[in-house]
């Protein structure tokens, strides 16, 4: 994240300089600078995400759109793609975040595998100054005064091409026990890197794990850190976008959790980090996602 933050917030040359540096003292200084840049990236991301969610909360009908389109003045263009991903994960539908300045908007969109974002933008091309990307991610430039018309056009197209909303698909690579998530095992997964659109990060399903602890995460407590337990084995998972008070699972609840695993360097050495992609009561399978999709279709007036 620190290397990526340089290109998002400053210049990628800072990250390149660190990778090429052969002097340990100079490298430490550059690394410290990258940490500062990454902190700025995190703050900008949190501020823009909060502003976007506030706009959507003020107009609840927009959350029922097939494609979420939200814009704001002066949002940092380097992080709007990350915010679009957060909105897509939260609402389970394609999301486009647009930063406006001097009458022009620069947007970044993300979409689940069930939706072709590039095809949607092609259908709206007359309203755009330029655009590019692929089915899952795209960027665009638009005149600010046309954002409203663009929102209507892309949702009209989506309603025609995708008449019944589908739940956000989540591909699981394997079922795992918490006891199997050891540092050596997770380190082996790095041999599958680099990860990206054509080679996504592996997702593991932890079944029938008990919620054994819940703590706020982040400077403002907008996220959760949850301890899950299976017998004598336990792990900590991070759930972003959900505060502890909003978590529907209490202590002792049995859940199924889909997680991405990675290694981070803690004070005591390498440790396993788990990011929770989805969580639901144990044993329910796909029922909650399918029911949510049907309910959204009902609210938006779609024939069931």
Model-found features: residue ranges?
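General beta-strand structural signal in soluble alpha/beta enzymes
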Residues: 70-71, 97-98, 130, 257
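Acidic, two-metal ion nucleic-acid-processing modules in DNA metabolism proteins
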Residues: 1-53, 89, 109-304
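Long, contiguous hydrophobic alpha-helical segments, chiefly transmembrane helices and signal peptides
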Residues: 79-80, 105, 257
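Flexible, glycine/threonine-enriched loop-and-boundary segments that flank and lead into catalytic domains
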Residues: 54, 58-85
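Residues immediately flanking
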Residues: 72, 85, 100, 144, ...
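Short glycine-cluster motifs
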Residues: 96-111
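Short, glycine/serine-rich, charged loops/turns that create anion-binding
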Residues: 23, 74, 102
């Amino acid at each position: 994240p620190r290397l990526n933050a340089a290109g998002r917030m400053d210049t990628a040359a800072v990250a390149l300089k660190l990778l090429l540096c052969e002097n340990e003292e100079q490298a430490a200084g550059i690394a410290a600078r990258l940490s500062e840049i990454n902190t700025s990236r995190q703050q900008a991301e949190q501020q823009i995400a909060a502003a976007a969610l506030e706009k959507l909360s003020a107009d609840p009908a927009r959350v029922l759109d097939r494609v979420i389109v939200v814009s704001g003045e002066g949002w940092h263009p380097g992080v709007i793609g990350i915010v679009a991903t957060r909105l897509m994960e939260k609402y389970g539908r394609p999301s486009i975040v647009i930063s406006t300045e001097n009458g022009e908007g620069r947007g970044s969109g993300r979409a689940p595998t069930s939706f072709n974002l590039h095809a949607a933008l092609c259908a709206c091309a007359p309203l755009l100054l330029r655009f590019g990307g692929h089915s899952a991610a795209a960027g665009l430039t638009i005149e600010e005064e046309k954002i409203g018309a663009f929102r209507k056009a892309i949702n009209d197209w989506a309603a025609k091409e995708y008449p019944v909303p589908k739940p956000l698909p989540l591909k699981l690579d394997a079922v795992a026990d918490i006891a199997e998530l050891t540092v050596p095992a997770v380190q082996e997964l790095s041999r599958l890197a680099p990860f990206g659109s054509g080679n996504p990060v592996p997702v593991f399903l932890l079944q029938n794990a008990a919620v054994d602890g819940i703590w706020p995460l982040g400077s403002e407590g907008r996220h959760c850190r949850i301890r899950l337990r299976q017998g004598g084995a336990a792990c900590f998972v991070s759930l972003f976008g959900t505060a502890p008070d909003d978590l529907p699972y209490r202590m002792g609840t049995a859940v199924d959790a889909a997680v991405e695993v990675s290694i981070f360097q803690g004070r005591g050495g390498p440790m396993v980090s788990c990011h929770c992609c989805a969580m639901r009561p144990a044993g329910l399978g796909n029922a909650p996602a399918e029911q949510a999709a049907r309910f959204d279709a009902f609210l938006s007036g779609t024939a069931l």
